[in-house]
Amino acid sequence: MIDNYIEKIAERSTSEITINECDYKKDGILYCGKCHTPKQGIYTVGRKTIKPLLLCKCGQEAYEKEEAEKKAKERELYIDRLRRSGIQDEKLLKCSFAIDDSPETKQSQAFRRYVDNWNEIAEKNIGLLLFGGVGTGKSFYGGCIANEIISRYTTPVIVTSIPRILNSLFGVEDKNGYISKLASVPLLIIDDLGAERDTDYALEQIYTVIDERYKANKPLIVTTNLSFEALKNPSDIRYKRIYDRVIEMCIPFNLSGVSRREAKAKAKAQNAKKLLF
């Protein structure tokens, strides 16, 4: 029985190792004609001696390179799946710190450090509140953070909006399961808070999602066009407990200044004039 097992090992090695024309025999075993290292071993088990084929030095290097490339490809595909399943706005998939036109600002630097220190950030449950006028880069930076954390840490991130959350809750049977998913994902980013419907049902669902996130002790990033004053003292009292919870969970960052959208539109118009007039 042992002899049969040994023979099977030898047969398997023979089928898995390629013998090249340049390979040669020396001291009773096969050597690689390229790197001149053994391609065959001698093993004695009991009364049985076998000479299974082995990977030579260059063969081992080629195998390790192939395995590394395979793992890198698998990781790349996994990251792509995470990004496409978690980031629900196609435009945000393209956001990257590499194309940030204001990398020197303290806000941009802080967001980069947020990613750099993600493991500690997640452990300490540190969220961000990005507020300011329209077109100042809030959604862009939210997308940058999401893409970078997914790519660097292979960590699931969900980037969504209140309207999307409400639509999903309306369309799914297992509402508790959906809310649980939003509560448990390592990082949840809610874009454009304050742009949602103001029905009692909508506000109750918004509070439930944010409160469940709070109870789960997971970081939350929120972007909004509202001012910090409007968040602290909302004109509609129904919003107060929602905004209070967000302020409690998130460190505020004011993204003010010239609208990036306006700046890009002007630059595009100038380029068009050069081409058309």
Tell what function each PLM region has.
Residues 192-193:
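Walker B catalytic acidic pair
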Residues 94, 98, 105-128:
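P-loop NTPase catalytic core of nucleic-acid-dependent motor ATPases
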Residues 103-115, 131, 146-187, 196-204:
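Short glycine-rich substrate-engagement loop in P-loop NTPases that contacts/grips substrate
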Residues 1-106, 257, 265-277:
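A short, basic N-terminal segment
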Residues 187-189, 221:
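Structural motif
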Residues 122-143:
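Walker A/P-loop nucleotide-binding motif
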Residues 120-122, 151-152, 180-182, 211-216, ...:
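Conserved catalytic network of the ASCE P-loop NTPase/AAA+ motor domain
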